[in-house]
Amino acid sequence: MAAPTRRTVLGLARCWRRFESPWSLGSRSLTLAAAPSNSASPWRLLGALCLQRPPLVSKQLTPMQEEMAALLQQMEIERSLYSDHELRALDEAEQLEKKKSDLYEEKDEKNILLVQDLEDMWEQKFLQFKPGARITDADVKNDRSSLHRKLDRNLILLVKDKLGDQDVWMLPQAEWQPGETLRQTAERTLATLSENNLEAKFLGNAPCGHYKFKFPQAVRAEGSLGAKIFFFKALLLTGDFSPAVEKGRHVWASKEELGDYLKPKYLAQVRRFLLDL
């Protein structure tokens, strides 16, 4: 009787030690992770804004797309039911047939809807309508600082900023400040950039990409090795830069035009999260 009892007690003790050891290790790990570090990071954190103006008009159809659209429209017409206007046209034709025969009565005249008159009026309105031009004055002048260009494409905002003693094109950015999230840094960038003239919708709280670079030697001597930039996407809703903003310091570029401004390594990281559908 004593032997089984002893084996049971020893088994419980071993189980307790196995149960206790992970929790003890986890407590030590949490304590070590929570310990503050006295060494400051040599990397500065920045939040960058990828502000896009979405297309304002649809793209031109390719010849194949036009053929497919015509085919689908023809199929829809063949399978569709009569619309209210077509039913009225049939009813009017029936009333006119009655008028030619002896079955027509004077009281039916007030119910006749002159469909042809309506169609003539609609035709006149259609002829007076003039669609807006796809090619704007900014397209003709190649004014890339204007927001009213390439209406059927996505445009990305680029700004010219100082990096050491050089003027470099980049996405708008600002340095992260303690107490704010990186998205709040990007939101602050938008507010200070346009003096609250631009309203945008940010897409998520997580960055869509990042880029790391080292400062020039003159700046690196101050204790910062380089910067880590975290990009946040946003869609432009309303607003534009005021006329007082210095020209030549910002452009609205399409995806193909980014290579005219951005450095190759920076451009490679930006293109990874850009979609031009």
From Swiss-Prot:
Entry keyword set: Acetylation, Mitochondrion, Ribonucleoprotein, Ribosomal protein, Transit peptide
InterPro entries listed in its UniProt record: NUDIX_hydrolase-like_dom_sf (IPR015797), Ribosomal_mL46 (IPR040008), Ribosomal_mL46_N (IPR021757), Ribosomal_mL46_NUDIX (IPR033650)
Location(s), subcellular: Mitochondrion
Gene Ontology CC entries for this record: cell junction; cytosol; mitochondrial inner membrane; mitochondrial large ribosomal subunit; nucleoplasm
Modification sites for N6-acetyllysine: K228
Location (main, coarse): mitochondrion
Highest taxon of source: Eukaryota
GO molecular function list: structural constituent of ribosome
Assembly description: Component of the mitochondrial ribosome large subunit (39S) which comprises a 16S rRNA and about 50 distinct proteins.
Entry similarity comment: Belongs to the mitochondrion-specific ribosomal protein mL46 family.
Protein name from the UniProt record: Large ribosomal subunit protein mL46
Recorded name of the encoding gene: MRPL46
